[in-house]
Each structure stands twice: as C-alpha cells, then as structure tokens.
Amino acid sequence: FHGRDIATIRGKAERCEYYRRVQGIFQDPFSSFNVFSKIDTVLLDCINMRGGRHLPRDKKIELMTEACSFVNLKFEELTNKYPFELSGGQMQRLMIARIFLLKPKVLLADEPTSMIDACSRATILDMLMNLRKETGMTIIFITHDIGLAYYVSDSVYIMEQGKIVEYGSADEVILNPKTYNTKRLISDVPKIYEVWDLSTV
C-alpha cells in the first residue's frame, strides 16, 4: 500500500493509520461486529479513528446521525442496541455507515451482498456506488457473480486458482472475453431462454 509491503507494518500507530485508509465489508455481517459492543460504540470508534476523539458530544451525534441517514437508518432507533438485534440487511448497511464515517482510500468488498435478499442487495449496491462517488474511494469488489461484476466495475480482473488470467475494462472482459477461463465463466451463467441440462445435477 503506497509502495509498502503491508506485512511490514508494525506498532499500534502504524496499524491504525493503515486501517484508517483501508477498510473492508464482508459477506457475513453477523461475524463482522463485536457482539459485546453497542452500535454507538461501533460508530464512535470510527470517529475516533478519524481524529475526532475530542469533538463535542453533540458533534459526534451529528456525525453518527448523518452516517446512519446515508444508509437509510435512524440513529435514534439504533442507540443502545447491539448489532445482533438488527436484520442482515440492516447490519450490512451499518457496515457501510462505518465506511461513510471512516472515508478510507481503499475499500475491500468481499461478496458484500451474498447473504442478503434480492431487494436489499440492490439497495446495498446503490449505497456503495453513491459512497464511491461521494468520497472518491477505490472499491475492490470480489464476487463470483459476473453480472454483478459488470454492473459495479470500471475494470475487471478474472482469477483462476489465485492467478490473474485476464483483465481490462468491464466491456472488454465481459462482452469480448479472450481467455478460455473467462469464456467458461460467462458461459456458466444460466440464461432464461435456454433449456437447462439437469442430467448432471
């Protein structure tokens, strides 16, 4: 990151600086939060990490309210609650509220919509795209869903057994694939106008 091997990062101050700049959203929201920390604490930690530890309490509440509002949550309904009291979709939105407060340079989004229903999925994706537009962050979106990759990406990298086998713009890679691996990946996407062969299922 910035020309440095992240494995060499040592000390609390360096780690805090790294995690302020690089954050993640993961596919399982239920394992992404400390079950003993209330939502207020989760959001306050983000403000503190951004250097807002000494802000007045009213200002901190204003920032947390703004972050929750960005993801269509009401802070006053979340205060004194624990993350596990929320639905999966709400927890995923809470993770995005964290990112809104932290404003990292890079966001690693690992299958962030795989465990939520289709309606919530579209909402979460739109929130991520709006957040990218508002903050200018780079989002590295990891997914097995080729249609989703096309929807959210400027550039696409196809990997096979841990190695990059093809990369380019979303249009180049998905609409005009060059390698066997990419062609196979795209051909495996079910098409509603084709008869499916279920004999191998």
Model-found features: residue ranges?
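ABC ATPase NBD coupling module
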Residues: D5-Q23, T41, V173-P177
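Conserved ABC ATPase signature
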Residues: Y82-L86, Q90
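Hydrophobic anchor residue at the start of the ABC signature
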Residues: I96-A97, I124
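Catalytic Walker B motif of ABC-type/P-loop ATPase nucleotide-binding domains
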Residues: L107-D110
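A short, surface-exposed alpha-helical micro-motif characterized by mixed small hydrophobic
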Residues: A149-Y151
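ABC ATPase "signature
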Residues: Y167-G168
